[in-house]
Curated annotation (Swiss-Prot):
Region annotation (Disordered) ranges: 18-38
Similarity annotation: Belongs to the glycosyltransferase 2 family. OpgH subfamily.
Taxonomic lineage: Bacteria, Pseudomonadati, Pseudomonadota, Gammaproteobacteria, Alteromonadales
Function: Involved in the biosynthesis of osmoregulated periplasmic glucans (OPGs).
Gene3D superfamilies assigned: Spore Coat Polysaccharide Biosynthesis Protein SpsA, Chain A
One Pfam family from the record: Glyco_trans_2_3
Protein name listed in UniProt: Glucans biosynthesis glucosyltransferase H
Domain of life: Bacteria
Gene Ontology cellular-component terms listed: plasma membrane
Transmembrane spans: 58-78, 97-117, 278-298, 408-428, 460-480, 496-516, 572-592
Species name: Shewanella baltica (strain OS185)
Pathway: Glycan metabolism; osmoregulated periplasmic glucan (OPG) biosynthesis
Molecular-function GO term, any one: hexosyltransferase activity
């Protein structure tokens, strides 16, 4: 398709002006983690503007510590009757680590439950005019352009209707490396500009080299354009946000001069597979309990989850520049899970970081299958374990360190749970197969029996299950109490059925995810880097042979654990069966939960329904319609050959190419750049050049005006004698 073949694109000039505004460079220096920078922390503008109430920390963190100490004492008492053996000490230590982890979530859940019982409403700041400027950033990496650009189109249009549109500029920041997707992005941007240029300022930039991934993408924007704006509202490629939420965030930031970052709690939407629906339902029913409780007690020392949050540009650029960690990945190099670190550094500098748990209208999507979840978690696991290098940073608030530690434990907890299961199994096998030493060297009229307090052990088991499932129970109680909420998910009966189904299916998936996380931790400890793979967001289905290969070790582990249990007794096998069944049937579970067809069956039945699915927000409906329209607009994708052939298309493409200098004078030429230069220079026609360029090299050519001009000057015709051979 050429420019003249589409009425929307009948122009050689980019509608709405330049693809990016004029640069206003600003400094964003990497922070020193080994010492506190001069001038930090800043003095708060408002008295007590960044001070939190200690009483809330005492209630939640103190309560979690007391609960953990009680449980650890009880576990010690279970073993202490007959004397504690080394293996029992190991069980006790592993139990202590795991229980502390769930106790904090439980106590946060209690706080969230009590707050949500009162049905809090978002604070009305009554700000009539925004005098600050906010850049809304939509980073994208090899995503479907129809999804990304249609979402921006809808959000920009609805925001313009509020009367506050003048205070916001929109930026799509692409790190795409696929040349086909890069050209589709340009097509979609032309459509977006045509639709929005009369009411919104929308821009597009694709980096030539995606250094430091998403964090580097945003940092590049800040260094070149950040000084133009007071705030940055960071989205993700699957984000949606209502106009009232966008303006509400900007108003809160404007009203609080000490606010450095305000994070929303996004609701999950658009799940089509059973796995996505499961995550949506759990996040909607139980998530607010944990999120609200967390936001309540962390107060000014909140966290950043990488998107759907607004950041003060000054705080971000002066305090959150990320350094490279010494060494190679996975523990060295660029900081992968940048969000937690950026929040900690912003708080270190004296700005507040707040979780806006009372602000609705923020949305995102979730992985469609167990395999897609595993791919994402492998990357997150590496980034979170990398935070072990960040924990000693000078000047961090202790709550910020706790955020980093909980992120680490989100993945280390799986190996700890597995070790606890294995040591418990070893205790059972030891009691069954190893003959006890009835009479010791010390004189006694009575034998020494290996005994433990079974009644206390059973009571502790019930307590542990109560702590583990407590947040779920709180979420269900809130659902049953609120008739309107219950009706929004299909009524109380369907809601209870959905909860039961979610608990059972989650219990089957949990051991699979435990082994997936254990494998991720092991591969990281072995020095393997995760790389950066694009995410699938819609269909999660895979061939059965692929699933068998991906879950082969999980099934084998389930069989081996079951065999070990049955060596002791059928009773032990029955006790372990909730954790083993999921491993035995990992392949069908993975296949069924990743299926759109099965997800559709549950949708029609009203199982695992959410309010956002049954009564979608207007912006979600508009985004769905707009995406279908964008799919039609870019149904005939451009190619590099067409760009070279059509002068008008070439001019439009060059208008969207990043204007940053290709290479600073005197800097070394990268190997791939040199190879591309040779291939282009030695080609005798466009077709022969395109025949020898791989996809990565084509992406580089698309971002290089000099190479494009050189190729454009070549004749199009391909003749045999023009072939160039390379070794």
């Amino acid at each position: 398709m050429t420019v003249s073949e589409n009425s929307v694109l009948e122009t050689e000039v980019l509608v709405g002006g330049s693809a990016m505004p004029n640069e206003r460079p600003g400094a964003m220096e990497p922070q020193n983690l080994s010492k506190m920078p001069e001038g930090f922390p800043r003095r708060s503008t408002v008295a007590n503007g960044v001070r939190s109430r200690a009483s809330r920390r005492f209630l939640v963190v103190g309560g979690a510590l007391l609960l953990s100490l009680f449980a650890i004492y009880e576990m010690g008492a279970v073993f202490s009757i007959g004397g504690i053996t080394p293996l029992e000490y190991l069980v006790l230590a592993l139990f202590a680590v795991n229980f502390c982890w769930i106790a904090l979530a439980f106590c946060s859940g209690i706080a969230g439950f009590l707050i949500l019982l009162r049905k809090p409403r978002a604070k009305d700041l009554q700000v009539t005019e925004l005098h600050t400027r906010t850049a809304i950033l939509m980073p994208t990496y090899n995503e479907s352009p129809d999804r990304v650009f249609s979402a921006v189109s809808v959000m920009a249009e609805t925001l313009s209707q509020t009367g506050h549109g003048h205070a916001f500029d929109w930026f799509i920041l692409s790190d795409t490396t696929d040349p086909d997707i890069a050209l589709l992005e340009e097509q979609a941007f032309l459509v977006l500009r045509q639709e929005t240029h009369k009411h919104s300022r929308v821009y597009y930039r694709r980096r030539r080299k995606n250094v430091a991934r998403k964090a580097g993408n945003v940092a590049d924007f800040c260094r070149r354009w950040g000084s133009r704006y007071d705030h940055l509202l960071v989205l993700d490629a699957d984000s949606l946000m209502e106009s009232s939420t966008i303006t509400g965030l900007a108003q809160r930031m404007q009203a609080d001069p000490d606010a450095g970052l305000i994070q929303t709690i996004p609701s999950l939407i658009n799940g089509t597979t059973l796995m996505a629906r499961l995550q949506q339902f759990a996040a909607r029913i139980y998530g607010p309990v944990i999120g609200t409780g967390l936001g309540w007690w962390v107060q000014k020392e909140g966290n950043f989850w990488g998107h759907n949050a607004i950041i003060r540009t000054e705080a971000f650029m002066t305090a959150a520049g990320l350094p490279n960690l010494k060494g190679k990945p996975p523990f060295g190099g660029h900081i992968m899970s940048h969000d937690f670190v950026e929040a900690a550094l912003i708080r270190r500098a004296g700005w507040s970081v707040v979780i806006a748990y009372d602000l609705p209208g923020s949305y995102e999507e979730c992985p469609p299958s167990i395999i897609d979840l595993a791919v994402r978690d492998r990357r997150w696991c590496q980034g979170n374990l990398q935070h072990s290098r960040i924990l000693p940073t000078k000047g961090l608030h202790w709550v910020s360190r706790l955020h980093l530690l909980t992120g680490i434990m989100a993945y280390l907890s799986s190996p700890f749970w597995l070790m606890l299961i294995l040591t418990g199994l070893m205790l059972a096998l030891q009691a069954h197969f190893i003959r006890p030493e009835y009479f010791t060297d010390q004189f006694s009229l009575f034998p020494t029996w290996p005994i433990m307090d079974s009644d206390r052990a059973l009571r502790l088991f019930y307590i542990t299950m109560g702590v583990l499932f407590g947040p779920k129970v709180f979420g269900v109680l809130l659902l049953l109490k609120d008739g309107e909420f219950a009706r929004s998910v299909g009524g109380r009966i369907k809601a209870i059925f959905s909860v039961i189904f979610e608990v059972i299916l989650s219990a089957l998936i949990a051991p699979i995810m435990m082994f997936i996380h254990c494998g991720a931790v092991m591969s990281i400890l072995m020095g393997r880097d995760s790389g950066w793979s694009p995410q699938r967001r819609d269909d999660g289905s895979m061939p059965w042979m692929t699933l068998i290969y991906r879950h082969r070790w999980h099934m084998l582990a389930g069989v081996m654990l079951g065999y070990a249990a049955i060596l002791d007794s059928l009773t032990l096998l029955a006790w372990m069966s909730p954790a083993l069944i999921g491993l035995w049937i990992a392949v069908p579970i993975s296949a069924w939960t990743g299926s759109v067809k099965i997800g559709e069956v549950f949708k029609r039945a009203g199982i695992l329904a959410t309010p956002e699915e049954r009564n979608p927000a207007q912006i979600c409906l508009q985004a769905h319609e707009a995406r279908a329209a964008y799919q039609k607009h870019i149904a005939e994708p451009w190619t590099l050959a067409q760009v070279l052939k059509d002068p008008a298309l070439m001019e439009l493409h060059l208008a969207m190419v990043d204007k940053q200098p290709l290479r600073a004078a005197g800097t070394p030429i990268e190997a791939m750049e040199a190879i591309v230069h040779v291939k282009v220079h030695e080609a005798r026609c466009q077709q022969s050049a395109l025949a020898v360029l791989n996809r990565q090299e084509m992406a580089m050519v698309l971002a290089n005006p000099l190479m494009l001009r050189s190729l454009q000057k070549l004749p199009e015709q391909f003749v045999e004698e023009d072939l160039v051979s390379f070794c």
